[in-house]
Amino acid sequence: MSPRISALLLPVLALLALPARSDVVTLTPIKDATIYNDTVGNRCDSKGLTMYAGQAGTNTTWPTRRAMVAFDVSAVPAGSTVTSVQVKLYMSKTVVGAKTFTLHKLTRGWNEGPTVGFSGDGNSAQVGDPTWLHTYFNNQLWTTPGGDFVATASASLSIGSTYQYYTWGSTAQLVADVQSWIDNPSTNYGWIVRGPEGGAKSAKQFETRESLARYRPQIVVTYTPPPPTAYCTAKTNSLGCVPAIGSTGSADFNAGSGFAITLSNTLNQKAGLLFYGTLGPATAPFQGGTMCVQAPIQRTVAQNSGGSASPANDCTGSFSYDFNVLIASGANSQLSVGRLVCAQYWSRDPAATFTTNLSNALRFYIYP
């Protein structure tokens, strides 16, 4: 290969070598609580500033306590691939040295009730609280007292001195847990936190979502978002060409530019425009083609397809619209981080049924 050709190929090869884009989101809980091994299931702490895990001393009737915490991971777009998960809890009180605490994936839904516990012993349960026996006091039960969860820990961590965040580092199982919640949101019940139980003191106090913002539980999720994906069927135009939608770049809430939604193989020197919606895809017959975007739709500015100059009549036309410019303009508040957008081109085709053409469509998410 000549040096000149090699030089021309270098930018292309560099683009091909770029790693897949990764995004990171930090989330706080949607619910957390402590349950206590009260044999009649009448003890909990749902709305307190702190939660507890491990074994307390013998001066209490219910020494074993377990903390539960769940996070809404819907900020990670559906179809994403999770690559790393870290779980962070702020530990604010202990009377023992370092102990190992584990996270276990919960397998049954539970409710964060109204009860506030003002100490490590919690308080009497009220309707809607979780307890050692109940997912929802006092008429919905765990299958197994103490909570239904996967026996094998998703992560473990030695926790020692107070007044600091402790981070369970990413493990294959933590990644699998969060991936399963993204793929199947109805199974997202969170984790239960356990310390050594049944023997010597081991209990630790952690801050909850009701605490000050700087102490609240967190998860940090790193993920590879799904690429823009073409779907639906384009209407064949009057010359027998099938327009094809495409894109370069990605929809970025903060970029300001750099996400071109394109259309090729369309009629030359014709008016057209990109339209879009945020309520998902559709497959409805429309003007001899298919409406691929769920109403209501929004239109962008009209363009000319260019291509061969008149009087030529061919399929050398094309369109391009930088969607990041629209996002950055703030003209549509629905174009927010994590939003699914579906987009499609409409263009003039004077010799076709209804004198119009509809392309196939593109679905994509807006990333932070």
Sequence positions of predicted segments:
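Proprotein-processing/basic-patch segments
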Residues: 24-30, 167-228, 357-368
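Acidic glycine-/aspartate-rich tracts in secreted/extracellular proteins
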Residues: 74-78, 92-95, 107-114, 175-176, ...
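A short beta-strand element within beta-rich, extracytoplasmic domains
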Residues: 71, 81-93, 219
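Flexible, small-residue-rich N-terminal segments that precede or flank a structured functional core
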Residues: 22-74, 197-200, 210-216, 220-224
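Extended extracellular/luminal ectodomain segments enriched in beta-structured repeat modules
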Residues: 64-66, 76-86, 254-257, 267-270
